[in-house]
Amino acid sequence: FISGVEIAATAFANIIEDKPVRPINTGVYVVFVLLWGTGLGIICRMVPVLVSASWVAGLSVLYFVSSVLQFKFLHLWYPIVIPLVLQAPLSFLGSTGIKYAWLFKEFLVKQRMEEDLTSGGDLQESMMPGECPVIEGYQIAAKSTQAREVGGDFYDFIEASEDKLGLVIGDVTGKSVSGALVMSASRSVFRMLSEGDLSVANIMIQANKRLKKDIRSGMFVALLFAMLDIKKKILTLCSAGQTQPIHYVAETGETLLVETEGDSFPLGILDDADDQDTNIQFKPGDKIIFYTDGIVEAMNAKEEMFGFERLMEIMEHAGEMDPESLLNEIVNSVNAFAGNVAQHDDLTIIVLGVST
């Protein structure tokens, strides 16, 4: 079937130039119309309304002019009006298709992130000690609460020898699978280095060198490592950017922030760290807490931080509580202070007490 316009055009061309007009292939034309409408829909979805309206108007004019020029110089004929009439519904379909394609892509990305977080959370949980070590003459309590599916905090107990116990508490910058892998690497490094005769400071120095090579740029570990001489009741510790421990001295009833020696930069930042040992001589009834910054930086609805002062006030009554009770008192106080406000950092604490 050939329309009257095409017949007239063909006859006119035959008479004037002896070059008949060629109708475009139906399949090609249908594909063109679909691509035309879909393309306009994509443009409408990707650019602002005023810009997309200008694009549609401009492309419509361009299409009309190109059709006339093709008819004149190439003798190629196809309906001009149909794409212009169908461009609105086809644009809507194209725009809707792009919208749902983006939504599906976002769904896949979110699903992958959730799977990564689940894997990271499982990995992190597997690294936490199942229970605190039982040592004659001492009491130990520990707890870690994640603010998200995958936290950045971790702690560990290392049986370096029959007479020595290592304690590690750290906070990794990345709270994802990569962060969990850094935790695993940190844990392995300290366990391995603790098997030798290195001092606490030298263990920290060697750990920093190894982690600096292994972890990617921009990630680091704020960590405190301590070694307890069980018989001598001496705790030797070294801090790399971790919060200051608090020591309750039973003999005087004082509560002291422990000042550590050295640079105290987190592991993975400096190539050569200048770490130094800090020694504490325990006496019966003494207690010391190690904790991450999620404790003191916990926020309430007024955007106030829990802070060191509140923590020190609790520690002033440490003599009245065993390590487990002291830990629960601190955690409950932080939770009561924060209320229903979602926290963005993990809460991790270790309490070490010397029996009377």
Task: Pin down the residues of each PLM region.
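Active-site His/Glu-centered metal-binding helix of metallohydrolases
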Residues: 12, 173, 295
